[in-house]
From Swiss-Prot:
Family: Belongs to the alpha-actinin family.
Record-listed Ca(2+) 2 binding positions: 805, 807, 811
Pfam families: CH, EF-hand_7, EFhand_Ca_insen, Spectrin
Any one GO cellular component localisation term in the record: cell projection
PTM annotation, UniProt: Ubiquitinated by FBXL22, leading to proteasomal degradation.
This protein's name: Alpha-actinin-2
Gene3D superfamilies documented for this protein: 1.20.58.60, Calponin-like domain (1.10.418.10), EF-hand (1.10.238.10)
Length: 897
């Protein structure tokens, strides 16, 4: 490798352009005389194929690149083909100097294009020097195939690379960075083809792991469809660590030129299409003008005869139809044609302007379709339209005068017909035959109003007849219908007059009969309503559910019922009088065969209702008698239960109250030994228990009272609930008092308090228990402590209160007071004493063993200690050591155990 670098350093073949700098970028060109074998193979194949792609245009080709260019003839031919210029006439001799002369002509031509050739001489080419021949061909490729490639002012190589990068940017797995490694997988070549000719290759089916297949596919498509010969072997590209850059650039430049030519062709086609589009648009505008002009002229031709028609119509409706058609023409048909005419002129001027701008000859419409021709036809249309409108208005005004009179007839006739509609049917009705007096009187008033209305319409009927006569005289076109209508109105008017008189007579006759019936109905209503109310009230009273709680109340109800029964004969006489009135009404209706109902308009009470309710009253009277007697018997039984319960309750209630007072007094006043007090309280308790049978008997009587639904008892102030509460309170009080004495005995024995001390404590507590309820408030307790010699500050008193009143109730019980005083005056055991005792059992060790506990303590206490003592973990600990210190502290609440 070092020797190769040295050769490259000592032997350099340089070539550059005087004015272009792209040649200075080809520093990768090997300066040594020997090429890398792989690169040489690739360059031979690529350069040979490139040369043949141009020589075939001249009908020839080369087989061996260093041999076929030795005489200079094909070299000169190659330059002529790729440049399009003629070179000097070659020498046809076969001598060496002839060949050198021809090669020099080619080299001179290359130099004339601005390429400076250094160390490349004709002799080396004639001698078949591979290195020099390939270098010369590469120089030609650079000058004629790559030099003209420029993208955004880049050099030839950079421009070609940038073109490749832009074209392949959207494709996956393609990243073109150079002209060697970036092309090894073949996807770059396939992407270039697909970008410009997506119809030739399906890029989505390509596999990056098949580089040889990708390269061969791209080369085959390029050779078959793009006229780019196969210049490389896929195996050489894939298997070479770094493919030859010149070979790749040469092959890729062919794609650039192939697709650049296609883009130029596309530009040319677009230019042609643009010109053709302008021409087609002009032709479309011409055709549209011809079509619009023809349609507009045809419409004018059809419309003018319609406007020139002056045939008059006989009716106003027909003339109004013509006027409406004309207005419809002016409103709907003409405005679009005005727009078409304006648009036609605009299109004509626009078309002429476009033709003038695009250097086309002016447009000449068909004969008769010039803008001036259309304007003339339009003027004739306007003239015909003006005369037609004047004629229409004059004719309409003439018909209006005649139609006004006919319309006046129709309006008056319609008004009269609407008024008269249904009047004959109303007058023929016999609704009064089944109407009430009020309804008949209303019918009479309504009939009087109708007669007034009938008289008022007399003038209208006369006017209708006069107008009909005038229309006949003026020879109105529809006079026959007018006469027929007028005759019907006059005939109907005569009929209405006759029917009106007959209805008045029938209404007045019916009114007199109904007035008689109405007086009877009114009298019935005045007497039936109070009597009906009396029966309803009686039924309510007889069926009323009475609730009484005493004998006096039921006796009062019985007396009221007897008074009610005494009024029944008088009520029956009133009932018969009311029924006779209704019988008189029915007699009148039957006598005159009237179709009215016998129902009374002044009363909702019917005869049948009176009969039914009277029978109901007669049934309820004996039922009420029976109910009242049964209730009287029940009240006598309830009174016996009240007296029986009251007799017992009035004894038990005071007895309980007396016992409560005795217990309360004894708890305060008892003196002497606590055991004597206990015996005395036990005797009290036994006496109370022995009294229980009296409570049970009272409960039985109370049960009977509840079953009888007796809720009050005027014979006693004690209820069963009072007795129960008092009895339970008595039992609770005696039990609590006994418990207090028992607690005092335990406290005395446990704390070593003497009976004298206990008596002093009781005396002090009773003295400061000002309300005598067994409780001292804060102030009383503080005064008690001060009286016993305690000098208390606020903090100390608060501490003591937290001991005697831990729940914050605000009071101190006697037991709490005893507990506090015993703590203050008696010896107490402490955690330190217990710890010292355990230390003795443990032989002064800080821990104790289970065996030692079982040996020194009873089995039950020993097991209790073993189960609850924690393991000892302090200094000198042994297996099974138990911590008696923590255990003892926990017994007195001084530990967290």
């Amino acid at each position: 490798m070092n020797s190769m670098n040295q050769i490259e350093t000592n032997m350099q073949y340089t070539y550059n352009y005087e004015e272009d700098e792209y040649m200075t970028q080809e520093e990768e060109w090997d300066r040594d005389l020997l090429l890398d074998p792989a690169w040489e193979k690739q360059q031979r194949k690529t350069f040979t194929a490139w040369c043949n792609s141009h020589l075939r245009k001249a009908g020839t080709q080369i087989e061996n690149i260093e041999e076929d260019f030795r005489n200079g003839l094909k070299l000169m031919l190659l330059l002529e083909v790729i440049s399009g210029e003629r070179l000097p006439k070659p020498d046809r001799g076969k001598m060496r100097f002839h060949k050198i002369a021809n090669v020099n002509k080619a080299l001179d031509y290359i130099a004339s294009k601005g390429v400076k050739l250094v160390s490349i001489g004709a002799e080396e080419i004639v001698d078949g020097n591979v290195k020099m021949t390939l270098g010369m061909i590469w120089t030609i490729i650079l000058r004629f195939a790559i030099q003209d490639i420029s993208v955004e002012e880049t050099s030839a190589k950079e421009g070609l690379l940038l073109w490749c990068q832009r074209k392949t940017a959207p494709y996956r797995n393609v990243n073109i960075q150079n002209f060697h490694l970036s092309w090894k997988d073949g996807l770059g070549l396939c992407a270039l083809i697909h970008r410009h000719r997506p119809d030739l290759i399906d890029y989505s089916k390509l596999n990056k792991d098949d580089p040889i297949g990708n390269i061969n596919l791209a080369m085959e498509i390029a050779e078959k469809h793009l006229d780019i010969p196969k210049m490389l072997d896929a195996e050489d590209i894939v298997n070479t660590p770094k493919p030859d850059e010149r070979a790749i650039m040469t092959y890729v430049s062919c794609f650039y030129h192939a697709f650049a030519g296609a883009e130029q062709a596309e530009t040319a086609a677009n230019r042609i299409c643009k010109v053709l589009a302008v021409n087609q648009e002009n032709e479309r505008l011409m055709e549209e003008y011809e079509r619009l002009a023809s349609e507009l002229l045809e419409w004018i031709r059809r419309t003018i005869p319609w406007l020139e028609n002056r045939t008059p119509e006989k009716t106003m409706q027909a003339m109004q139809k013509k006027l409406e058609d004309f207005r419809d023409y002016r409103r709907k048909h003409k405005p679009p044609k005005v727009q078409e005419k304006c648009q036609l002129e605009i299109n004509f001027n626009t078309l002429q302007t476009k033709l003038r701008i695009s250097n086309r000859p002016a447009f000449m419409p068909s004969e008769g379709k010039m803008v001036s021709d259309i304007a003339g036809a339009w003027q004739r249309l306007e003239q015909a339209e003006k005369g037609y409108e004047e004629w229409l208005l004059n004719e309409i005004r003439r018909l209006e005068r005649l139609e006004h009179l006919a319309e006046k007839f129709r309006q008056k006739a319609s008004t009269h017909e609407q008024w008269a509609y249904g009047k004959e049917q109303i007058l023929l009705q016999k609704d009064y035959e089944s109407a009430s007096l009020t309804e008949v009187r209303a019918m009479l008033r309504k009939h009087e109003a109708f007669e007034s209305d009938l008289a008022a319409h007399q003038d209208r009927v006369e006017q209708i007849a006069a107008i009909a006569q005038e229309l006949n005289e003026l020879d109105y076109h529809d006079a026959a219908s007018v006469n027929d209508r007028c005759q019907k109105i006059c005939d109907q008017w005569d009929s209405l007059g006759t029917l009106t008189q007959k209805r008045r007579e029938a209404l007045e006759r019916t009114e007199k009969l109904l007035e008689t019936i109405d007086q009877l109905h009114l009298e019935f209503a005045k007497r039936a309503a109070p009597f009906n109310n009396w029966m309803e009230g009686a039924m309510e009273d007889l069926q009323d559910m009475f609730i009484v709680h005493s004998i006096e109340e039921i006796q009062s109800l019985i007396s009221a019922h007897d008074q009610f029964k005494a009024t029944l004969p008088e009520a029956d006489g009133e009932r018969q009088a009311i029924l006779s009135i209704q019988n008189e009404v029915e007699k009148v209706i039957q006598s005159y065969s009237m179709r009215i109902s016998a129902s009374n308009p002044y009363s909702t009470v019917t005869v049948e209702e009176i009969r039914t309710k009277w029978e109901k009253v007669k049934q309820l009277v004996p039922q009420r008698d029976q109910s009242l007697q049964e209730e009287l018997a029940r009240q006598h039984a309830n009174e016996r239960l009240r007296r029986q319960f009251a007799a017992q309750a009035n004894v038990i209630g005071p007895w309980i109250q007396t016992k409560m007072e005795e217990i309360a007094r004894s708890s305060i006043e008892m003196t002497g030994p606590l055991e004597d007090q206990m015996n005395q309280l036990k005797q009290y308790e036994q006496n109370i228990i022995n009294y229980k049978h009296n409570i049970d008997k009272l409960e039985g009587d109370h049960q009977l009272i509840q079953e009888a639904l007796v809720f009050d008892n005027k014979h006693t102030n004690y209820t069963m609930e009072h007795i129960r509460v008092g009895w339970e309170l008595l039992l609770t009080t005696i039990a609590r008092t006994i418990n207090e004495v028992e607690t005092q005995i335990l406290t005395r024995d446990a704390k070593g308090i003497t009976q004298e001390q206990m008596n002093d404590f009781r005396a002090s507590f009773n003295h400061f228990d000002r309300r005598k309820n067994g409780l001292m408030d804060h102030d009383d307790f503080r005064a008690c402590l001060i009286s016993m010699g305690y000098d208390l500050g606020e903090a100390e008193f608060a501490r003591i209160m937290s001991l005697v009143d831990p729940n914050g109730q605000g009071t101190v019980t006697f037991q709490s007071f005893i507990d506090f005083m015993t703590r203050e005056t008696a010896d107490t055991d402490t955690a330190e004493q217990v710890i010292a005792s355990f230390r003795i059992l443990a032989s002064d060790k800080p821990y104790i063993l289970a065996d030692e506990l079982r040996r020194e303590l009873p089995p039950e206490q020993a097991q209790y200690c073993i189960k609850r003592m924690p393991q000892y973990t302090g200094p000198g600990s042994v297996p099974g050591a138990l911590d008696y210190t923590s255990f003892s502290s926990a017994l007195y609440g001084e530990s967290d155990l």
